[in-house]
Swiss-Prot record:
Protein family membership: Belongs to the purine/pyrimidine phosphoribosyltransferase family. PyrE subfamily.
E.C. number: 2.4.2.10
UniProt-annotated binding residues for 5-phospho-alpha-D-ribose 1-diphosphate: 29, 75-76, 105-106, 109, 111, 130-138
Source taxonomy: Bacteria, Pseudomonadati, Pseudomonadota, Betaproteobacteria, Burkholderiales
A single MF term (Gene Ontology): orotate phosphoribosyltransferase activity
Quaternary structure and interacting proteins, as annotated: Homodimer.
Keyword set includes Iron: no
Record GO cellular component, one term: cytoplasm
Protein name: Orotate phosphoribosyltransferase
PROSITE patterns: PUR_PYR_PR_TRANSFER
Known role: Catalyzes the transfer of a ribosyl phosphate group from 5-phosphoribose 1-diphosphate to orotate, leading to the formation of orotidine monophosphate (OMP).
Keyword Magnesium: yes
Residues the entry annotates as binding orotate: F37, F38, T134, R162
Length: 224
């Protein structure tokens, strides 16, 4: 499930402008050589994170998913949940709703408030927010935390769906990591944009035409 076409297109342009999305030849975590690379860690200033949060908020509103709060898994999800909560508070479609958020620590504190959870109590329908889904480990841990607190995972919200099958080349999964998460936990995965939106840019903008064939070949081999 992706955001609206206009939101997705604007986000792809934004990611390119920020140097977060690049074309070339990159060895990614899976060991594959990818013709594009998306590094959300390069959203690292107040301006860029503020704009990113606006895209997350719009994608969540576009999705129509019913939710009560946000959860950001440590560590990357922490600033994403925080900033997106702020963006939602100012979103016209939210009608003044003040969306709470929480996140976890990797290690429990034994002083102060203690425990592994920080922020609002986990209650109601909770949206997990992260940058991408690679192996689904972060989502699994988040679902366990949310359910243990008596709350309900409502959706996973990510920046980019790579639409890519997992596994070695001689034993590729028929599903992507995003599809596996949706099937395993019975919840939608909402992305601001996807590889399909990147391909649309490559097809429509002559500036990036030189990368079109490589990305299409990669998608044909590994895509879903």
């Amino acid at each position: 499930m992706s955001a609206s076409a206009s939101t997705a297109a604007d986000f792809v342009r934004f990611a390119l402008d920020e140097g977060v999305l690049r074309f070339g030849s990159f060895k990614v975590k899976s060991g594959r050589i990818s013709p594009y690379f998306f590094n959300a860690g390069l959203f690292n200033s107040g301006r860029s994170v503020g704009a990113l949060a606006g895209f997350y908020a719009q994608a969540l509103v576009d999705s129509g998913v019913a939710f009560d709060m946000l959860f950001g898994p440590a560590y990357k999800g922490i600033p994403l949940a925080t900033a997106t909560s702020v963006a939602l508070a100012g979103h016209a479609a939210m009608a003044g709703r003040d969306v709470p958020f929480a996140f976890n620590r990797k290690e429990a504190k034994d002083h102060g408030e203690g425990g592994t959870l920080v922020g609002a109590p986990l209650t109601g329908k909770v949206v997990i927010i992260d940058d991408v889904i690679t192996a689904g480990t972060s989502v699994r841990e988040s679902v366990e935390i949310i359910r243990a607190a008596g709350a309900e995972p409502a959706a996973v919200l990510i920046a980019l769906d790579r639409m890519e099958r997992a596994g070695p080349d001689d034993a590729l999964s028929p599903h992507s990591a995003v599809q596996d998460v949706a099937r395993t936990y019975g919840i939608p995965v909402v992305s601001i944009a996807s590889l399909a939106d990147i391909m649309t840019l490559l097809q429509d903008d002559a500036q990036f035409a030189e990368h079109r064939a490589a990305v299409q070949a990669y998608r044909s081999k590994y895509g879903v």
